[in-house]
Amino acid sequence: MIIGIGSDLIDIRRVAKVIERHGDRFLNRVFTEIERAKAERRATNEKMVVSTYAKRFAAKEACAKALGTGIRQGVWWRDMGVVNLQAGQPSMMLTGGALKRLQLLTPPGLEVRIDVSLTDDWPLAQAFVIISAAAAGKL
């Protein structure tokens, strides 16, 4: 069963301007340590760094929409983090208010799966998030 679907489209140049203006203050407020490390591994190409941050920002927006809250009601930026599963595909790791909200939405006895799709084509980045639940072992 689908619990929530969210999508977001963002102009990468907008993220670049915010990073230029606010720097580490913005990065530390919005992104998890894992997300910052992923972006900084691409430090040889500034466009790739900014694109990496923009896709993750879009994923957070999409996830907040899938949770039905937006960035409010106790759900904050760093409560949602893009992580890569062992095979490489992106997913979301939720903590804090985002995890509490997900637990409220999940029917008892069901297991949650969060599917994430990220893409960019300069100057745009896009993310889709689908939160689903099924009986254990059925996802």
Swiss-Prot record:
Gene Ontology terms describing biological process: fatty acid biosynthetic process
SUPFAM superfamilies with a match to the protein in the record: 4'-phosphopantetheinyl transferase
GO molecular function: holo-[acyl-carrier-protein] synthase activity; magnesium ion binding
Enzyme class label: transferase
Reaction(s) this enzyme catalyzes, per UniProt: apo-[ACP] + CoA = holo-[ACP] + adenosine 3',5'-bisphosphate + H(+)
Gene3D superfamilies assigned to the protein according to its UniProt record, in alphabetical order: 4'-phosphopantetheinyl transferase domain (3.90.470.20)
Keywords assigned: Cytoplasm, Fatty acid biosynthesis, Fatty acid metabolism, Lipid biosynthesis, Lipid metabolism, Magnesium, Metal-binding, Transferase
Annotated GO CC locations: cytoplasm
Entry cofactors: Mg(2+)
Enzyme Commission numbers on file: 2.7.8.7
Family: Belongs to the P-Pant transferase superfamily. AcpS family.
Function: Transfers the 4'-phosphopantetheine moiety from coenzyme A to a Ser of acyl-carrier-protein.
Name this polypeptide is given: Holo-[acyl-carrier-protein] synthase
